[in-house]
Design a protein with these regions (language model features):
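Sec-dependent signal peptide recognition
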Residues: 1-10
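N-terminal leader/linker segments that initiate helical-solenoid repeat arrays
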Residues: 12-90, 106
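Amphipathic alpha-helical scaffolding segments comprising HEAT/armadillo-like alpha-solenoid repeats
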Residues: 26-37, 59-70, 86-101, 119-130, ...
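Short inter-helical turns and helix N-cap capping residues of alpha-solenoid HEAT/ARM repeat scaffolds
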Residues: 42-43, 71-73, 103-104, 132-133, ...
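Conserved hydrophobic register position within alpha-solenoid helical repeats
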Residues: 50, 78-80, 111, 140, ...
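Core register positions within helices of long alpha-helical scaffolds
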Residues: 53-56, 82-86, 114, 143, ...
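Solenoidal tandem-repeat scaffolds enriched in leucines and small polar residues
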Residues: 166-177, 195-208, 226-232, 239, ...
């Protein structure tokens, strides 16, 4: 770890920085070379973490450097910021292109990511996509996808038929990232490729186009022997927003693989498939996987059917607190609910702050006068958001019995709660 950090500090301070962020160019060749060398010598896990986060949330926006250690080198932020910019240095571009064939997969990926976000010409990318080396073709396809380079679309479509799986599958992924409907025909053909990985990438990419006319190409994949393919197909179908896939996705709720069931639940929520309500309610209460249960609760909230109140209330007693939280949150979304279940009232006193918060917000949303005391009790909660929800809920009831609780809230330590209490009292006394 110390060795890794040593290399990274050497990279970050190479070719220093310090100009305002809006004037900083992309990284030059010295900085790019130092970064790639550092990553080549560090722990593979660290390299992969940096590759994932490269360019994300790195821009320095606090000249005062608050929250930074006082002895931290000031140049490091500038070095990081330069890598969020577009590389334009011709020598850096040459180095990045030359690194696309390196043996180190992580370094290769970082180089491709930087190249994709750079000023590299379409002609150079197309040349790399046709390189004799499958490794370079795959890396170039990744670069084209990262940069969403529409000017490489035809070359990527051609690459879908590559005899090597890596470049062909990466071309499918890149076309999905580019989102150009003109690629549909090539992707429709590729879902029938002999390589499972190419079929997977192509099905995913068709989903990214969000066009219901491609349902016929992806729907059969819900019966594929590979659970990853079935899950990807379910996700893609959800994005296509076709009313013709509801029954097939409901059928996928009984898939033996948890990832497929989760994807089917999410897709049904995206489609607002109301015919799935009963099946989702059953899965919420009976599935062996808590993540599937949580997705079911969220989906039922999206579908908003009043009949889901009873199963969601039962889910408040689930052994998994995250399922309880999701159920409490979903209840607030249901339509035409006027009577709060006892389980929801009990959840407002939970020791878990998030569950208590979700339950209080749902209770306030329902506005059942029988729960007035439960909301009044939450006016003294230690959590500001809970107090605020309770005050707003009491105000919406517009009944004199809420006045004592709202009057107490006028002395709350938080000004937002005090303002809400004053407004709620105004409504109550109208």
């Amino acid at each position: 770890m110390i060795r890794a950090m040593h290399f990274l500090v050497l990279w970050a301070t190479a070719a220093g920085g310090g100009s305002p962020e809006w004037e900083r160019p992309g990284a030059d060749s010295a900085r790019v070379a130092a970064l790639l060398a550092a990553l080549a010598h560090t722990d593979p896990v660290i390299c992969d973490l940096i590759g994932d986060q490269l360019g994300n949330f790195w821009m320095g926006d606090d000249p005062a450097r608050l929250g930074r250690f006082s002895d931290a080198p000031t140049r490091i932020q500038g070095a990081k910021d330069s890598l969020a910019g577009s590389v334009t240095d011709p020598r850096a571009l040459t180095l990045l292109a030359a690194t696309l064939g390196t043996d180190n997969a992580c370094v290769r990926r970082v180089a491709a990511k930087l190249l994709g976000r750079s000023a590299v010409s379409a002609a150079v990318l197309r040349e790399l996509l046709a390189d004799p080396s499958p490794r370079i073709r795959e890396s170039a396809a990744f670069a084209a996808g990262v940069g969403e380079r529409r000017d490489t679309r035809a070359a990527l479509e051609h690459l879908l038929a590559d005899t090597a799986t890596g470049p062909a599958a990466m071309a499918g992924w890149a076309l999905g990232e580019i989102h150009d409907p003109a690629s549909a025909q090539a992707l429709q053909g590729a879902v029938h490729a002999s390589s499972p990985r190419v079929r997977l990438a192509s099905a995913w990419a068709l989903g990214q186009l969000e066009d219901a006319s491609f349902v016929k190409d992806v729907l059969p994949l819900l019966r594929d022997p590979d659970p990853l393919m079935r899950a990807t197909a379910a996700e893609a179908l959800g994005r296509m927003k076709s009313p013709r896939v509801g029954a097939a996705l409901v059928g996928a709720l009984s898939d033996r693989n948890t990832a497929v069931r989760r994807a089917a639940v999410s897709a049904l929520a995206d489609l607002h498939e109301r015919s799935a309500v009963a099946a989702l309610e059953g899965l919420l209460l009976n599935d062996s996987d808590s993540e599937v249960q949580r997705e079911c609760a969220r989906a039922l909230g999206e579908l908003r059917a009043a009949r889901s109140l009873e199963p969601l209330a039962r889910a408040l007693g689930d052994r998994d607190v995250e399922v309880q939280r999701a159920a409490a949150d979903a209840i607030a979304e249901l339509e035409d609910v006027t009577k709060a279940p006892a389980a929801l009232v009990r959840a407002t006193t939970s020791p878990d702050p998030e569950l208590r918060r979700n339950a209080t917000k749902s209770l306030a949303r329902i506005g059942d006068p029988a729960t007035l005391q439960a909301l009044a009790d939450r006016v003294g909660d230690e959590d500001k958001d809970i107090r605020l929800a309770a005050v707003e809920g009491l105000g919406e009831m517009k009944i004199p019995a809420a006045i004592p609780g709202l009057t107490r809230a006028l002395n709350d330590r938080d000004p937002e709660v005090r303002r809400a209490a004053a407004e709620a009292l105004g409504k109550t006394q109208e």
